[in-house]
């Protein structure tokens, strides 16, 4: 009888943990920036840029190899966040060469948060409570916890147990 109770308790605890560690869904790749919803992959336009407020910098990052092609990336720097626009997949999606989409969103300030409420300054424990254990990795001296759905990824930079920044981006399918 005790063995069955232990097994039942183990299964119930697994179910509770699994429920808390829900996989990423499409809404996880949308954030609200200056009261404007911005989604990975949405068209980048002058109207969208203006709705986000005044950028302090708009710069050409370069032509970046991604998948089977090279694509143009631009960085748009705002107070608490950056948005990278790119002409990703214009050639395979029958779009104009100079049509851009939101290719990466970087959250740097506590007023910008993910769809699940994680912002720079949140605890690492809070991230794993809402997203699960994720994939931990080190890059250039920084610790990251990452989560992926298809070719989209959310990564949390962790410094001293707190979220320092959050990247929401596409994953190069060659990696």
Predicted features and spans:
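A cross-family detector of function-defining hotspots
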Residues: 44-97, 116-162, 168-175
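Boundary at the C-terminal end of the N-terminal hydrophobic targeting segment
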Residues: 18-21
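Solvent-exposed, conformationally flexible loop/turn segments
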Residues: 40-42
